Amino acid sequence: MSVMFDPEAAIYPFPPKPLPLNLDEKQFYREKIKRMLKERDAVMVAHYYTDPEIQQLAEETGGCISDSLEMARFGAKHSASTLLVAGVRFMGETAKILSPEKTILMPTLNAECSLDLGCPIEEFSAFCDAHPDRTVVVYANTSAAVKARADWVVTSSIAVELIEHLDSLGQKIIWAPDKHLGNYVQKQTGADVLCWQGACIVHDEFKTQALVRMKALYPEAAILVHPESPQSIVDMADAVGSTSQLINAAKTLPQQKLIVATDRGIFYKMQQAVPEKELFEAPTAGEGATCRSCAHCPWMAMNGLKAIADGLESGGAAHEIHVDAALREGALLPLNRMLEFAATLRS
């Protein structure tokens, strides 16, 4: 594939880890957040990959814990005038696209995503222009500008079904930005898929030989894998799926030990779903101290209690998401196509 930008060669600067809080500080910020959510007529939506204490707070305050699209849909349906989005920036953008009349706040606007960073709109648009015969399908983990350039937006939970549908219509596909998910979808469907070469820095680090060794230690364990992982990891899986699909798989699989190849933030909701089961993180390069993310997104970790309290208290340019009106209209079209398609799958 010939593109000006090479996501595989990109090195993304990681944010510093938030300063740890003591128990008194945590309690102070928890109470402050609860109070300010009420004062601002706000509801908190948190991604599965945020830290457990953030997910717990979302639950306690009547919010939502889910994947990025369901976060946005929950916010759109909720009566609150303000959404506090605990996640990464594209999630706040998606919420604003679906709820333009609401105030969308984030703990920080510097919470990035390697998939988003790895798909700059200028280079991606040029790539699409070079293949005008292909239908452009982009993952939810992209900027509003990239979504606006696409024909379809898709989540991992319906990616296979959507590509099967487009393939049945004789359409050839450009898939972006995640190469591993794109390759997985292509293998599952047999469709003509041209992949952009981005990757999630968390899932890209799962190591095959280390997973083989872990499986040998726990031969009775099932392996659950998110399809953003490399194909060699997917090939070892007993279940492959999106975050919500992996939680469901944890409930339905008979094994009492589960090795989970996705961000360890998912363990909070997964353990709630299967309290009797033992969960293990799939290995990255952590043993050799060469992993960068070590099974937890460093940008998700920016969503700390202090940052959430600051976002609710201060708002403004440092915390509020804005999406240009024309860009919003462009991104809303492929998002609505996906939502309508997803509705047909549920009916």
From Swiss-Prot:
Q: Which organism is it from?
A: Enterobacter sp. (strain 638)
Provide the primary localization. Answer: cytoplasm
- Which NCBIfam families does this chain map to? nadA (TIGR00550), PRK09375.1-1 (NF006877), PRK09375.1-2 (NF006878)
Q: Where does iminosuccinate bind?
A: H47, S68, Y139, A140, N141, S156, H226, P227, E228, T243
Q: Gene for this protein?
A: nadA
> Which terms under GO biological process does the entry name?
'de novo' NAD biosynthetic process from L-aspartate
Instruction: Please name the SUPFAM superfamilies in this protein's record.
Output: NadA-like (SSF142754)
What pathway annotation does it carry? Cofactor biosynthesis; NAD(+) biosynthesis; quinolinate from iminoaspartate: step 1/1
Species classification: Bacteria, Pseudomonadati, Pseudomonadota, Gammaproteobacteria, Enterobacterales
Protein name stated in the entry:
Quinolinate synthase
Residues engaged in binding [4Fe-4S] cluster: C113, C200, C297
